[in-house]
């Protein structure tokens, strides 16, 4: 008996050794346990039960083999009409739960092109039969199919009170801990985009909570980028976690993934500096080539986020310059706008933009030309072929300017004023009372910005076009509003004001924060007599003010000085050249009879003591007067 038992166990162990390599770890442990139990079992244990126990892991292994596609699966995928799918229910095919779910998913896809047919589908008897079949076997639907199924039911417009929809939602809740991270993300996107019902929003909140808790499960860059694009914007805590994960995996990103992350950040206006720095490093250091689409999107994202990285900007400009012959007019306009937002003036690239416009003068559309013109004005760029370029601009605008959106008309004329290319007819078009009245008293930020540009256009006509006969903005419109001085005080502004107060000694010897009728605010204004002494500025006539306070004429030989501080954002990136807007401001103030005392941030930062700052301003004033006398 003992010998027979040992022989039997030897056979069992040999069988186990042969099956072990193909088994999962759990199966091997189970088999080892069975063998151990065989050796230690009593003689009364029925040996006949052992083969069944040993075969159990083998059966599980067979169950985990890849799914073999059946004919009905092929029919579902190839169906082009809803009727073909519904006929599968009444035919010889015996659909299981997964196939029923696949039919619903395919129906949703087909009806996305014909949304008017959804109502008829929901009333179809076969459709209700399909829902009942699915509802009865929902627990056996695969995870991936379940994640797509819920979105399809939302897209088909299944009523929220439907027990089938509620059953699927409840099944999702039960399986949340088992679902893969990408399935959770897909479900969250479906709840957010395809349904606005209260019950789906509650499910969305649960899904986002799970996504926030399980963010460490993300192991590859593709999943990470997909989740960031699809559901990152739905939850601030989730987005913070995804950005942390992005920093961890960014070295594995390819050009297209870097592009997607940047576009996503730009779309959400998320200026994540650590992530942008990491992406910039890899854009500069890695040898991969960037396609035209990637270059355009990267330039747009950096411009939209106002993130300045010199090496990235240089690479973008260089690579795009080499691709100029292949760019369309729309891409040139898009690219020019991006670099204008980025405040990066690459002279060869912008000359190429101007040449592209001239080469395609007959084909370029007005919107594209407008984008290029506005970009040139922002950066104060004057092309070498200036006459030809602006002749084309005036030719295109001549008949079409009145038909454009009013705010765009103002933007274009303002841009021409910045570049000193505006014509009298164009000034008259936007300064006409019937036109500008729509912007008077505007409450929105856009209307206020547009009216501010109208003030600048009005100042251009008044100061730079001596033969201009009108119309002009009314006196009531050019009077500075309460918001003209309602701005956050910068550190440079505060220090400059304190130094000026100490320099003047008395409040009547100068004015701080002077709002002019030209739409510009002076940091300070002083009046010097012929000996260089301060005069009480408020006692004298000031034509630059909408409501002058003084009545006396300035004495002969007196000089009116305006102090203008220039902050870091007022300049082109990595340059000491002012942006077009501030070039226009300086030009207007000079034309109004002022001597300019420029106070740029890069000079002020070098001054450490109050004495140095006071001496700096005195020296600037003397130089301004000396330059005027030298003329």
From Swiss-Prot:
Tissue and organ expression note: Ubiquitously expressed. Expression detected in spleen, thymus, testis, ovary, colon, heart, smooth muscle, kidney, brain, lung, liver and white adipose tissue with highest expression in smooth muscle.
GO cellular component, one term: mitochondrial matrix
GO molecular function: RNA binding
Consequence recorded when altering residue 531 to A: Does not affect location in mitochondria; fails to rescue the increased accumulation of the level of mature MT-ND3, MT-CO3, MT-CYB or MT-ND5 mRNA in TBRG4-deficient cells; does not abolish the accumulation of the MT-ND5-CYB precursor RNA in a TBRG4-deficient cell line
Residue list for modification Phosphoserine: 553
A single BP term in Gene Ontology: mitochondrial RNA processing
UniProt note: domains: RAP domain is required for TBRG4 function in mRNA stability and translation.
Family note: Belongs to the FAST kinase family.
Role noted for this protein: Plays a role in processing of mitochondrial RNA precursors and in stabilization of a subset of mature mitochondrial RNA species, such as MT-CO1, MT-CO2, MT-CYB, MT-CO3, MT-ND3, MT-ND5 and MT-ATP8/6. May play a role in cell cycle progression.
Protein's recorded name: FAST kinase domain-containing protein 4
Species of provenance: Homo sapiens (Human)
């Amino acid at each position: 008996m003992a010998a027979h038992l040992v022989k039997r166990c030897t056979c069992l162990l040999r069988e186990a050794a042969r099956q072990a390599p193909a088994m999962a770890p759990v199966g091997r442990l189970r088999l080892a346990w069975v063998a151990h139990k065989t050796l230690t079992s009593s003689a009364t244990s029925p040996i006949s039960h052992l083969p069944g126990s040993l075969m159990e892991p083998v059966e599980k292994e067979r169950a985990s083999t890849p799914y073999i596609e059946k004919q009905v699966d092929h029919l579902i995928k190839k169906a082009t009409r809803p009727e073909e799918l519904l006929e599968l229910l009444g035919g010889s095919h015996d659909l299981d739960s997964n196939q029923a779910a696949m039919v619903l998913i395919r129906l949703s896809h087909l009806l996305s092109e014909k949304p008017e047919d959804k109502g008829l589908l929901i009333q179809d008897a076969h459709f209700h039969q399909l829902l009942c079949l699915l509802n009865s076997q929902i627990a056996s639907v695969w995870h991936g199919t379940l994640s797509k199924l819920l979105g399809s039911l939302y897209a088909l417009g299944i009523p929220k009170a439907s027990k089938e929809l509620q059953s699927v939602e409840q099944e999702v809740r039960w399986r949340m801990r088992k679902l893969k991270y990408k399935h959770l993300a897909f479900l969250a996107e479906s709840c957010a985009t395809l349904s606005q019902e209260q019950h789906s929003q509650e499910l969305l909140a649960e899904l986002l909570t799970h996504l926030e808790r399980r963010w460490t499960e993300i192991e590859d860059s593709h999943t990470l980028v997909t989740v960031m694009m699809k559901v990152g914007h739905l939850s601030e805590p989730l987005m913070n976690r995804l950005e942390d994960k992005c920093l961890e995996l960014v070295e594995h990103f390819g050009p297209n993934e870097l592009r997607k992350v940047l576009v996503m950040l730009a779309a959400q206006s998320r200026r994540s500096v650590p992530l942008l720095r990491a992406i910039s490093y890899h854009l500069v250091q890695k040898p991969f080539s960037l396609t035209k689409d990637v270059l355009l999107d990267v330039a747009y994202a950096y411009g939209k986020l106002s993130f300045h990285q010199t090496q990235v900007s240089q690479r973008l400009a260089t690579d795009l310059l080499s691709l100029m012959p292949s760019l369309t007019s729309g891409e040139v306009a898009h690219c020019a706008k991006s670099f204008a937002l980025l405040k990066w003036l690459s002279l060869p690239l912008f000359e190429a933009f101007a040449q592209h416009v001239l080469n395609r003068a007959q084909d370029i559309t007005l919107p594209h030309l407008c984008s290029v013109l506005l970009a040139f004005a922002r950066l104060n760029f004057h092309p070498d072929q200036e006459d030809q370029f602006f002749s084309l601009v005036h030719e295109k605008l001549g008949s079409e300017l009145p038909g454009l959106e009013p705010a765009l008309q103002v933007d274009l004329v303002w841009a021409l004023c910045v570049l000193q290319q505006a014509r009298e007819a164009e000034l008259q078009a936007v300064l006409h009372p019937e036109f500008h009245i729509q912007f008077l008293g505007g409450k929105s930020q856009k209307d206020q910005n547009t009216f501010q540009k109208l003030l600048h256009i009005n100042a251009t006509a008044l100061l730079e076009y001596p033969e201009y006969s009108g119309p002009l903005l009314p006196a009531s419109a050019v009077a500075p509003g309460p918001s003209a001085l309602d701005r956050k005080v910068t550190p440079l502004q505060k220090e400059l004001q304190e130094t000026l107060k100490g320099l003047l000694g008395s409040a009547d010897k100068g004015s701080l924060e002077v709002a002019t009728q030209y739409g510009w605010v002076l940091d300070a204004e002083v009046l010097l007599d012929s000996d260089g002494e301060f005069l009480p500025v408020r006692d004298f006539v000031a034509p630059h003010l909408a409501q002058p306070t003084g009545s006396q004429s300035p004495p002969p030989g007196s000089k009116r000085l305006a102090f203008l501080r220039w902050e870091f954002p007022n300049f082109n990136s990595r340059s000491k050249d002012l942006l077009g807007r501030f070039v226009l401001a300086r030009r207007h103030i000079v034309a109004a009879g002022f001597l300019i005392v420029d106070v740029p941030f890069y000079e002020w930062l070098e001054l450490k003591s109050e004495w140095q700052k006071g001496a700096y301003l005195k020296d600037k004033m003397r130089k301004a007067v000396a330059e005027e006398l030298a003329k």
